[in-house]
Amino acid sequence: MVLVPFLLISCEKEKILPLIDVPTEISNYVSTHFPENPIIQAIKDTDGFELTYDITLEGGFFIEFNRKKEVIDIEGLTKLPDSVIPAKLLEYATTNYPDNYIIGWELDDRNQQIKLENGLELEFNMNGDFLRIDN
């Protein structure tokens, strides 16, 4: 019996981008919605056929963009700017949780979620209709 050696190759590759190489769409998004929070690190993350950009901003904000350079995840240590939250989700949160604020927003294949600073995660469909509290 002959054993054939094989090589395990990782499909995941992270590359730190020089700030000058951050795609224009991403730089524009950050300067529009986070004018006081410049980019301090940008990582281009390739995992198989999936490509994302993981952006860290000054002030404790983290944004993930997909291969089309569309936002799919935003997290903050403090309140996110209202301009980054879809209007229906923002309206729902401010109406039903007036004493709280949003520190996270995420988009997946079927739904979107917001996270409040009190730890609650609220799930919505793609039209912005409330579905449930996600524990």
Each language-model region and where it sits:
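Short, conserved catalytic or interaction motifs in soluble domains
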Residues: 13
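Sec-dependent signal peptide recognition
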Residues: 1-4
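First exposed extracellular module after export/assembly in secreted or surface-exposed proteins
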Residues: 18-135
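C-terminal motif of bacterial Sec signal peptides marking the signal peptidase cleavage site
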Residues: 7-10
